[in-house]
UniProtKB/Swiss-Prot annotation:
Lineage: Eukaryota, Metazoa, Chordata, Craniata, Vertebrata
Gene name for this UniProt entry: GAPDH
Name of the protein described by the UniProt record: Glyceraldehyde-3-phosphate dehydrogenase
Binding site for D-glyceraldehyde 3-phosphate: 149-151, 180, 209-210, 232
Entry-annotated residues carrying N6-malonyllysine: 192, 213
Species name: Sus scrofa
Subunit: Homotetramer. Interacts with TPPP; the interaction is direct. Interacts (when S-nitrosylated) with SIAH1; leading to nuclear translocation. Interacts with RILPL1/GOSPEL, leading to prevent the interaction between GAPDH and SIAH1 and prevent nuclear translocation. Interacts with CHP1; the interaction increases the binding of CHP1 with microtubules. Associates with microtubules. Interacts with EIF1AD, USP25, PRKCI and WARS1. Interacts with phosphorylated RPL13A; inhibited by oxidatively-modified low-densitity lipoprotein (LDL(ox)). Component of the GAIT complex.
Length: 333
């Protein structure tokens, strides 16, 4: 089983750790976070306002974080180059600070003995992989990869199924996205993105997202055919993608439902879900799929122009894909 270090014990770092313990697919052996001491880590891992209390045991013992009886080495280094991943036995590192997202910056982990780095965010220059879409293109010459964004992980599997069957001529995506840590609780300064600094709990905030364009990186045939934007809304978790696209081949809405349902039960099982229930966002909290197609919410104007709706737990679904990508990479060693 691949031995993993986690850099940055924030929302994604903690939930990747949860996903690892829930699934038993990878072995977390080390965690680095300069801003959270050991006893605070115990507390933050045990209690989660969004996903509830951890079902298991968590304690501090002999300077280590012990989860379900497993001792995890703790580092508190600010510079990734100084983290001794090798000493802790970690061969893969999940880079989940949100800070070191380029090949050069994430590459610092290799100095401490890590063999590979998985960036849990989009990257300007690291190759991006989306499970179920282009993960087969991974080869073990790559030392640093990106798991793309939560929104790209929601959109890409759906876009792939639609494009494979009907062809996407062009499309626009909107994600109605839950609050994340980069937003402000009340109005505050926010660099160049003035709107992003407005109070998260009070507003619907139009924002930019590279998620749709990134689909063109993981599905090259769609490069230049998709773009999109986001609305940040005052909910703590779970987001929804609205993909409005023009189809090459004519398709009845029922035809679209059929192919998505087949994909959800076949090649994309566990990644792309399908529901005909009258669901709302809360129903997907702690859901492990990358994307769940909402058959009842979509609409068709005609056989060539459709609006498709897909839900995602932007925290937990994504964190589970980080684990799955590491398992896939390990299978190629």
């Amino acid at each position: 089983m691949v031995k993993v270090g986690v850099n940055g014990f924030g929302r994604i770092g903690r939930l990747v750790t949860r996903a690892a313990f829930n699934s038993g697919k990878v072995d977390i052996v080390a965690i680095n976070d300069p801003f959270i001491d050991l006893h605070y880590m115990v507390y933050m891992f045990q209690y989660d306002s969004t996903h509830g209390k951890f079902h298991g045991t968590v304690k501090a013992e002999n300077g280590k974080l012990v989860i379900n009886g497993k001792a995890i080495t703790i580092f508190q280094e600010r510079d990734p180059a100084n983290i001794k991943w090798g000493d802790a036995g970690a061969t893969y590192v999940v880079e989940s600070t949100g800070v070191f997202t380029t090949m050069e910056k994430a590459g610092a982990h290799l100095k401490g003995g890590a063999k590979r780095v998985i960036i849990s965010a989009p990257s300007a220059d690291a190759p991006m992989f989306v499970m179920g879409v282009n993960h087969e293109k991974y080869d073990n010459s790559l030392k640093i990869v990106s798991n793309a964004s939560c929104t790209t992980n929601c959109l890409a599997p759906l876009a792939k199924v639609i494009h494979d069957h009907f062809g996407i001529v062009e499309g626009l995506m909107t994600t109605v996205h839950a609050i994340t840590a980069t937003q402000k609780t009340v109005d505050g300064p926010s660099g160049k993105l003035w709107r992003d600094g407005r109070g998260a709990a009070q507003n619907i905030i139009p924002a930019s997202t590279g998620a749709a364009k990134a689909v063109g990186k993981v599905i090259p045939e769609l490069n230049g055919k998709l773009t999109g934007m986001a609305f940040r809304v005052p909910t703590p978790n779970v987001s929804v993608v609205d993909l409005t696209c023009r189809l090459e081949k004519p398709a009845k809405y029922d035809d679209i439902k059929k192919v998505v349902k087949q994909a959800s039960e076949g090649p994309l099982k566990g990644i792309l879900g399908y529901t005909e229930d009258q669901v709302v966002s809360c129903d997907f909290n702690s859901d492990t799929h990358s994307s769940t197609f909402d058959a009842g919410a979509g609409i068709a104007l005609n056989d060539h122009f459709v609006k498709l709706i897909s839900w995602y737990d932007n925290e937990f679904g994504y964190s589970n894909r980080v684990v799955d990508l590491m398992v896939h990479m390990a299978s190629k060693e």
